[in-house]
Swiss-Prot record:
Pfam families: V-ATPase_G. This is V-type proton ATPase subunit G 2. GO terms for biological process: synaptic vesicle lumen acidification. Keywords: Cytoplasmic vesicle, Hydrogen ion transport, Ion transport, Membrane, Transport. It comes from Mus musculus. Subunit of the V1 complex of vacuolar(H+)-ATPase (V-ATPase), a multisubunit enzyme composed of a peripheral complex (V1) that hydrolyzes ATP and a membrane integral complex (V0) that translocates protons. V-ATPase is responsible for acidifying and maintaining the pH of intracellular compartments and in some cell types, is targeted to the plasma membrane, where it is responsible for acidifying the extracellular environment.
Length: 118
């Protein structure tokens, strides 16, 4: 009987060791999966940063030339407005005199299409 209980004890201990090994293997596998997931996440983040940086540089290059164009257009517009204002200042008195002359100087005339009927 003693040898039988001893054999059962050995089997139980072997089963316990096997269960511990399986549990350790599962833990190692979980750790490896977690580590692989973290590494993949870091790679994705690094790739995302690289692409974002590339996009920003291309956008800056495109917007830089557009910004210069915008500044040139704005400067040309200012020059035109300034030219119009100076022209208005130069011609103001002459135009006012012409308008007042046309309004105040009335010359009565008979319309050419008017027919006198007697």
């Amino acid at each position: 009987m003693a040898s039988q209980t001893q054999g059962i004890q050995q089997l139980l201990q072997a089963e316990k060791r096997a269960a511990e090994k399986v549990a350790d293997a599962r833990k190692r596998k979980a750790r490896r999966l977690k580590q692989a997931k973290e590494e993949a996440q870091m790679e994705v983040e690094q790739y995302r940063r690289e692409r974002e940086q590339e996009f920003q540089s291309k956008q800056q290059a495109a917007m830089g030339s557009q910004g210069n164009l915008s500044a040139e257009v704005e400067q040309a517009t200012r020059r035109q407005v300034q030219g119009m204002q100076s022209s208005q200042q130069r011609n103001r008195e002459r135009v006012l005199a012409q308008l007042l002359g046309m309004v105040c100087e009335v010359r009565p005339q008979v319309h050419p299409n008017y027919r006198v009927t007697v």
